Amino acid sequence: QKYFANTEGSYIDQDIHRIWPNFTVTAVDPQKGKFQTRDALSAPMGLGWDYLSARPESKIAGVTTRYGNHYDMLEDAAAAAQQAREKHASKSVEPGKYDLVLDPSHLWLTIHESVGHPLELDRVLGYESNYAATSFATLDKWKSKSFNYANRLVNLFADKVQPGSLGAVGYDDEGVKCKRWDLVKDGILVNYQAIRDQMHILGERESHGCCYADNWSSVQFQRMPNVSLAPGKENLSVQEMIKGVEKGIYIIGDGSYS
């Protein structure tokens, strides 16, 4: 439960649900003295216990089952145990150059680090450098309107309104109504994540609504909202995506962080 009031006349009461059921399975080979792990394929969500209802329609078939808005923790734990054991017999990846195909359960981290943090305007301005440093996506690149952040097929957006997402709320911690906006459009850098006291720098009159404090006693400041890769125009299966990859690695889940 979050209650917000300010001297401008805002009185906002929000009931916010968040859940992240998580685990790590460790398989030990006592003869070799080695161990392998496999983490859960769950996701942090803006949902309640209904996320654990394990509905069949939320299961995504593949080399391992992945999950949408409902998660089967027992099924995933059993698969994790088997796959952790299988990793003991797996070959190491040979050094070299590979094409990568990243499942959303892994891609989220790539987006978080390579797009989310660099496009936090406080890092761009040098106000913040904790953990993820400052940013290469400087204001001159944005002002040029031609900085290629990614391939022209790539569209990335920020929001705090996707139903069921971890960052979804009605209003941020400055009392600003949340919304969605573009960060990268057709591969070009078009915007940042910014709050009320930063918007004049971007020539905008309205905050993006991504201000956050982790506690009533903490000072709220600009924090990363949901940052997402927009789907492509073609609805491709994994098999269709990888059929043209001659030397590549397909990654599901994350075994480490940045």
Predicted feature residues:
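A glycine-rich phosphate-binding loop feature that marks nucleotide/adenosyl-phosphate handling sites
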Residues: 1, 94-107, 159, 163, ...
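Short, glycine/acidic-rich beta->alpha junctions
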Residues: 4, 92, 173-176
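Short linear interaction motifs
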Residues: 4-5, 78-82, 161
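A short, structural micro-pattern
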Residues: 15-19, 94, 148-150, 221
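Generic structural signal for well-ordered, non-membrane alpha-helical segments
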Residues: 16, 70-77, 81, 149, ...
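Internal alpha/beta scaffold segment
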Residues: 18-123, 191
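Dual-mode signal for accessory low-complexity, basic/Gly-rich regions
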Residues: 57-60, 129-258
